[in-house]
Amino acid sequence: MGIPVMIIGKSGAGKSTSLRNFGEDELYLIKVLGKPLPFRKTFKSTFETDDYQAVAKALKKTPKEAIVIDDAGYLITNHFMNNHASAGKGNGVFTLYNEIGDRFWRLVEYVINDLPSEKIVYFMMHEDKNDAGDIKPKTIGKLLDEKVCLEGMFTIVLRCMTDNDKHVFRTKTTGADVTKAPIDMFEDEEMDNDLKLVDTAIREYYGMIKKQEEETNGET
């Protein structure tokens, strides 16, 4: 049972930058758009694709335990842009939206049900504001949002944002966003936008690795 984690944020909020503290051989990066990273590092395990089947195969095949899909929202956008012209109108459009929602839903379900428990898959997505003013992951509109509540498939949703010129992760909802995490997984409501720290906290919480303080106490 793999763990899917959603990271949302505006462009420039620091989502991709949060990967910076992973070692070059520590992370498997799936680039949906193929854009360069915003820091001087190249991850040895990098794959560029926007094909759902290719993504699923890559998730299964890689021995890496930390995996990032950046930007996962463009799996949705690219599918729509590549197929909407041929969908026509009426039922064709609804069929396309059903297919788009189904494919993303199946990918998250695949992570949960088919990957080993030590694999954590981070879905990086842009954020959007709905008509009620709530901050949520950006999709392609109401037709898709009515079919599947993306954030509802994730136990952990962190929001990347800027606070006084500092890039941070929000770990607890403000009441106007979909940020959430299990009780006591993170010590603070805000933390540095360091996905390596997040990854460590998740693994400690679920007992995949020992807490650093326990290891330190054991050595003394």
Q: Where are each of the predicted segments found?
A:
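Conserved P-loop
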Residues: 1-69, 73-78
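A general structural signal for short secondary-structure junctions and capping/turn motifs
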Residues: 18-20, 58, 113-115, 147-151, ...
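Conserved nucleotide-binding/hydrolysis micro-motifs of P-loop NTPases
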Residues: 24, 33-37, 73-74, 127-131, ...
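Short, well-ordered beta-strand core segments
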Residues: 27-29, 121, 157-159
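A short helix-to-beta-strand connector/capping loop
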Residues: 42-46, 117, 153-154
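Conserved acidic residues
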Residues: 65, 119-120, 151, 155
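P-loop NTPase motor core
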Residues: 71-149
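Conserved GTP-binding G-domain of TRAFAC-class P-loop NTPases and closely related GTPase folds
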Residues: 130-220
